[in-house]
Swiss-Prot record:
Alphabetized GO MF terms: structural constituent of ribosome
Family: Belongs to the bacterial ribosomal protein bL33 family.
GO biological process: translation
Gene3D superfamilies reported in the protein's UniProt record: Ribosomal protein L33 (2.20.28.120)
GO cellular component, one term: cytoplasm
Entry keyword set: Ribonucleoprotein, Ribosomal protein
Coiled coil: none
Superkingdom of the source species: Bacteria
Lineage: Bacteria, Pseudomonadati, Campylobacterota, Epsilonproteobacteria, Campylobacterales
Full protein name: Large ribosomal subunit protein bL33
SUPFAM superfamilies: Zn-binding ribosomal proteins
Matching InterPro entries: Ribosomal_bL33, Ribosomal_bL33_CS, Ribosomal_bL33_sf, Ribosomal_zn-bd
Length: 56
């Protein structure tokens, strides 16, 4: 059985440093790091969240 090309990633808040969201992405088709504007519950506002690797 072949190993899948999807990896687990977390989305870390650039202001407070918390990892608030986790998701998966295809590492072969999306080579650049993901950067999304998401809600940070600690700061109670929308901030930039950047991709970090999670332990699988």
């Amino acid at each position: 059985m072949a190993k899948g090309s999807t990896i687990k990633i977390g989305l870390k808040c650039s202001e407070c440093g918390d990892i608030n969201y986790s998701t998966t992405k295809n590492a072969k088709t999306n080579t650049e790091k993901l950067e999304l504007k998401k809600f940070s519950p600690r700061l109670n506002k929308h901030t930039i969240h950047k991709e970090v690797k999670l332990k699988s």
